[in-house]
Structure formats: structure tokens, C-alpha cells
């Protein structure tokens, strides 16, 4: 039977400033840590990415034409404040006013993120969010944006606090490239959650119009053998690192006893301690019921085994299937040999994990209010067919269809899910894979910056029109 989605459902497309805009040093934009990190370590940079800085009218016209009625956009903090604080860059401000006006002209609702992996370099060098001064600067920047852009009705503080701590201090594939430092991982998570809570409280106290929330990446963690206590414990600990610690801070305003026991165990094995103040708990508590929505980014699930050894992670950046290794001291190891399809980058395709994660939020955090699936999609080595000027991306259509089906199931089972944003609207630059890995509804020829709708774009258009998942 064909499943349907609600009449008022948002069928969106997602982007991010650094991955889409290009123009990394145009019109007074300040540097971000990624600029230097890519120059020093990789064979690609985010210049010109998808040239969204100049081509946004084209992408928004395509959005309107293909039934995309919501877009995730992030403001580049360093376009507004090149150093993260102090002097405002008027050209950056003007750009976002023009961009939001174009969104409204095309009837595409902008869902605007304040921070999407791109702390200004000046602040990043000084410890990023491990330095509590960055919290203050972020809140000042947030307040400036709330005042300056009343045309925005949906705000998100951060995109993926979990993967920021994970990428910067655990896997080491984000600048500053530190590995296996659990103290920094949890402190980064916590400090960013304090910054989130302060910004949300300020938004509500200031009486700004619209809604505010946060976007969390929530990969579901399962024990490889549910009857093996070591595997069960490994899944619980891995879930605390990636999901529970951050969800507790968001909706409980504190960390549950089980969460803190898990954190203390991980830190006792690996070294380090957390610095959490009474004021931190007070602000987390003050904000816990003020989030209007939760954005869930979901791509994959993981299966965990018990593990008694040192930490070792090998990140698959090449798309050669089978190149991943992930084992953490005192936590567990990911088992890749499971009967689940996976992408060329070893991401486990498991739609049931999205259903389970949504229902977990509904059950454990009943004050969640509503959910948007803010990212979900398939990274693929798309083959452009020159004669047809398109891509036959049936695998992407199938991936999205499967995930929308479980979203429909979750709604039927009582979850308040209000929209879905495919990652990504058009092909964009990928943080650790450059330009090889494509996700978009619209194919971007990065040489000419021309856009070509893929087969998935036509499928998505029909979906948005009929609300039927075919």
C-alpha cells in the first residue's frame, strides 16, 4: 500500500554555507579553520564549491520548479563577523538579506542555521568551543542575527554538535585534527550545548518572532549480538558519545545518571575530566522546554561489539568499500560485517534505524515538541549521461523512498514529524571527500557551475505534489 505524508509537510533541500557558497574570501569574509586545514592537508578546497554565493537565484528557481518548499541554509559566521566578534561586515549582511528575499520570492521557506562546522579561524585557533569565550561570542552573533534578519522564521543554533566534537577530537578528520581525546569530545559537546541553551533563552526572552531549535546527528547504535552483555554495553556507550549526552542536555537540562556513569567510565579508562558548572546546569535547565523543534540528521546506523584494546579509527575518505576501522578503548568496536547494505563509504543503509531513533526521542524526551528530518540522503559517485544531461540515480530514489516510508510509519505511531530535507539540494563540496561524493537532486558541473536535474529531482517533484511515497 502506498503511504502518504501530511498536507502541511515540508519537502525541503539542505545546504550549508561552506559546502555550497564558495567565495571563501570574497566581500570581506573572514577565514575559517577549514580554509587552512584543506590547503595544508588535502588536494581540494571549498573554492568555488557550488558557487551558491552567486548562483542562489538559479538554485531557488529550480527549487520552486521542482516542488521544494523549504531550504536549509547556514549563515557563515565569518561573513557577518570576519573575526567572530567586533566589527560587522556589511557586505555579508547584505548578501543574506538578498538570499532570504529570493527564498520568499520563490516560496521556499528558509530554515537558517547559525553555525555549520565553520567557526571563524581567529576563534578556532583559540580553542574553538573548548574556550568559553567562544560561547559568549556565539551568543552575541546569534543576537545580532535575530535582530538583523526578522524575515527568518525558523532558526537553528548549531548543526551537528556531536560530529563536531567527534571530527575535531576523536576521529581527527576535522581541524585541529586531534584523535582519541575524550575529555575534549565531551567538553566540546557540553560547551556547545550551553551556547545553544543561552541562544535559545535569549531568543525567547527577546520576544523574537518565529521558531528556534537545534539539529543533531543521531546515528542509531545497536549491539551486534543483543544476547552478549559486552556488545550491549558497547552500544550503550557509543550511544552516549554520539546521541544521549547531547539529547539529555537539550531536553532534560542535565545529564541523566546513566549518561554520567557512561561518561565517567570512558574518561576513567582514557583519562580526563569534565568541567561543568552550576551556572551551566542552570542555563541548560532554563532552555530545556524552549526548543520549538528538533532537527534530526540521519544517514546510517552502527552495530557494536565489545572491545578490549587501544583506540584505532581508519576513516574511509576514498569510497573504496571496506576501508573503515573503528575501535575505541573502553567503549567498543563497530562491526561492518552485518547483513545490511552499505554505501561505498561504508555507511550502513538501515531505514529502521531512523524509525527507532524518532520513536526513542518521542519516548525518552516527550518535550521535543516536533521533529524535522533535516538531513538524509545518499552519497554516490553519480554518472552524468551527457546525451541526456541527467543522472539516473535510482539508488538515491530508493534510499529516500525507504526512509520516507519509515517517517510515515513514525507519524502514524504518534511522532510529530513536520518535514524532510534531502541532503543535498544540489551537489556540494564534501568536508572529507571533496567533490567525488555527490548527494544533490541537481547535478552540478563543477567546471561550468551549470545545474542539471537528476532523475531523483523529478521523483521528488511528484512526491511533493501528491504527498504519496511511490
From Swiss-Prot:
InterPro entries: 6P-beta-galactosidase, Glyco_hydro_1, Glyco_hydro_1_AS, Glyco_hydro_1_N_CS, Glycoside_hydrolase_SF. It comes from the Bacteria. The keyword Hydrolase applies. D-galactose 6-phosphate binds at residues 19, 116, 159-160, 297, 430-431, 437, 439. Keywords: Glycosidase, Hydrolase. GO terms for biological process: lactose catabolic process via tagatose-6-phosphate. It catalyses: a 6-phospho-beta-D-galactoside + H2O = D-galactose 6-phosphate + an alcohol. GO terms for cellular component: cytosol. Its EC number is 3.2.1.85. SUPFAM superfamilies: (Trans)glycosidases (SSF51445). The active site is at residues 160, 375. Pathway: Carbohydrate metabolism; lactose degradation; D-galactose 6-phosphate and beta-D-glucose from lactose 6-phosphate: step 1/1. GO terms for molecular function: 6-phospho-beta-galactosidase activity; beta-glucosidase activity. Belongs to the glycosyl hydrolase 1 family. This is 6-phospho-beta-galactosidase. It comes from Staphylococcus aureus (strain JH9). The gene is lacG.
Amino acid at each position: 500500500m502506498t503511504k502518504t505524508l501530511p498536507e502541511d509537510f515540508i519537502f525541503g533541500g539542505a545546504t550549508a554555507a561552506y559546502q555550497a557558497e564558495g567565495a571563501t574570501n570574497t566581500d570581506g569574509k573572514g577565514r575559517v579553520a577549514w580554509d587552512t586545514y584543506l590547503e595544508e592537508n588535502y588536494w581540494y578546497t571549498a573554492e568555488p564549491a557550488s558557487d551558491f554565493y552567486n548562483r542562489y537565484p538559479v538554485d531557488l528557481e529550480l527549487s520552486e520548479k521542482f516542488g521544494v518548499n523549504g531550504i536549509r541554509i547556514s549563515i557563515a559566521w565569518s561573513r557577518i563577523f570576519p573575526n567572530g566578534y567586533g566589527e560587522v561586515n556589511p557586505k555579508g549582511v547584505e548578501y543574506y538579506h538578498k538570499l532570504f528575499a529570493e527564498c520568499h520570492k520563490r516560496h521556499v521557506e528558509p530554515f537558517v542555521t547559525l553555525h555549520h562546522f565553520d567557526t571563524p579561524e581567529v576563534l578556532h585557533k583559540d580553542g574553538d568551543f573548548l574556550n568559553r569565550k567562544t560561547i559568549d561570542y556565539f551568543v552575541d552573533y546569534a543576537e545580532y542575527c535575530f535582530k538583523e534578519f526578522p524575515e527568518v522564521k525558523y532558526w537553528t543554533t548549531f548543526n551537528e554538535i556531536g560530529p563536531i566534537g567527534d571530527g575535531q577530537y576523536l576521529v581527527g578528520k576535522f581541524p585541529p585534527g586531534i584523535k582519541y581525546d575524550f575529555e575534549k569530545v565531551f567538553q566540546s559537546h557540553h560547551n556547545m550545548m550551553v551556547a545553544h541553551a543561552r541562544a535559545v533563552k535569549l531568543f525567547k526572552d527577546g520576544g523574537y518572532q518565529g521558531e528556534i531549535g537545534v539539529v543533531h546527528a543521531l546515528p542509531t547504535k545497536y549491539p551486534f549480538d543483543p544476547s552478549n552483555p559486552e556488545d550491549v554495553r558497547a552500544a550503550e556507550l557509543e550511544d552516549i558519545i554520539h546521541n544521549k549526552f547531547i539529547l539529555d542536555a537539550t531536553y532534560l537540562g542535565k545529564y541523566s545518571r546513566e549518561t554520567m556513569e557512561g561518561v565517567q567510565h570512558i574518561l576513567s579508562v582514557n583519562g580526563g575530566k569534565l568541567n561543568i558548572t552550576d551556572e551551566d546546569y542552570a542555563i541548560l535547565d532554563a532552555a530545556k522546554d524552549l526548543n520549538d523543534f528538533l532537527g534530526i540528521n540521519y544517514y546510517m546506523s552502527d552495530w557494536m561489539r565489545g572491545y578490549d584494546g587501544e583506540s584505532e579509527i581508519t576513516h574511509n575518505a576514498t569510497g573504496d568499500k571496506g576501508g573503515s576501522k573503528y575501535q575505541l578503548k573502553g567503549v567498543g568496536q563497530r562491526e561492518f560485517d552485518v547483513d545490511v547494505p552499505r554505501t561505498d563509504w561504508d555507511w550502513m543503509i538501515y531505514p529502521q534505524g531512523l524509525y527507532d531513533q524518532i520513536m526513542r526521542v518521542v519516548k525518552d524526551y516527550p518535550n521535543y515538541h516536533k521533529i524535522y528530518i533535516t538531513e538524509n540522503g545518499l552519497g554516490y559517485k553519480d554518472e552524468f549521461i551527457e546525451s541526456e544531461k541527467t543522472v539516473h540515480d535510482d539508488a538515491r530514489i530508493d534510499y529516500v523512498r525507504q526512509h520516507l516510508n519509515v517517517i510515515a510509519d513514525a507519524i502514524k505511531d504518534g511522532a510529530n514529524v513536520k518535514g524532510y530535507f534531502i541532503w543535498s539540494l544540489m551537489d556540494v563540496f564534501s568536508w572529507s571527500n571533496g567533490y567525488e561524493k555527490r548527494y544533490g537532486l541537481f547535478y552540478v558541473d563543477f567546471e561550468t557551475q551549470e545545474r542539471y536535474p537528476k532523475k531523483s529531482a523529478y521523483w521528488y517533484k511528484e512526491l511533493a505534489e501528491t504527498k504519496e511515497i511511490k
